[in-house]
UniProtKB/Swiss-Prot annotation:
Ligand binding (ATP): 8-15
Name of the protein: Dephospho-CoA kinase domain-containing protein
Domain of life, source organism: Eukaryota
Organism per entry: Danio rerio (Zebrafish)
Ranges where the DPCK domain occurs: 3-207
CDD domains xrefs: DPCK
Similarity comment: Belongs to the CoaE family.
InterPro entries linked: Depp_CoAkinase, P-loop_NTPase
Metal-binding is among the record's keywords: no
GO molecular function: ATP binding; dephospho-CoA kinase activity
Gene giving rise to this polypeptide: dcakd
Keywords in alphabetical order: ATP-binding, Nucleotide-binding
Example of a GO biological process term: coenzyme A biosynthetic process
Stored Gene3D superfamilies: P-loop containing nucleotide triphosphate hydrolases
Pfam families: CoaE
Amino acid sequence: MFLVGLTGGIASGKSTVSSQLKELGCPVIDADVVARKVVEPQTAAYRLIVRHFGQEVLSENGEIDRKKLGQIIFSSPEKRRLLNSITHPEIHKEMLKQILLYFIKGYRYVILNVPLLFETRRLTRFLTHTVVVYCDPATQLSRLMQRDALSQTEAEQRISAQMPLKEKRGLANHVIENSGSREDTHRQVLRLHSKLDDCMQFLIIRAVAVAALTGLGGLFIYTVKIITS
């Protein structure tokens, strides 16, 4: 089994590409979905967030209010680093558990949808392919303002909190250009899916002989360490 990292910037279209890959039968682990799970009430991350950020980040039902928390961390790099130090280990732990489940079920590759893939770099050493969903800056800004009902200043602040898309584009093996129509994006997703399929047989044969010496073996060791830590 091999791993494919899918990333991009806020409002660049990662969710669109992820959904299209799921429709093609690809197993996808979404870090944003996992992130919501690991901060549910009574989890370790939830308790630490409340301890460091206070009761004001909670909604009336006691759950983390993502909008309130977002307003804090996107205006303070220090607070953002603190939140990441709380949530990222728990997110990676849960993702690694899901990867192992897909491996046990016999899947030949898994796509990891990780917004901060290149910022944290904790998972990049285990990836065979990396994919960036790219759109031009003007399109990204417009989409974010419309999607989250933000002012231009608020949207620019959130975009600047991440690594620039142009820089991410230069780090990836594959780029999906998502500035145009949904149909054009889908054609690119189909081409990516075909490339992944084409390399499957080679990797299956190769994995039988060298799995213990490659990233998969390292992944198991890393998983044991992080789960038992």
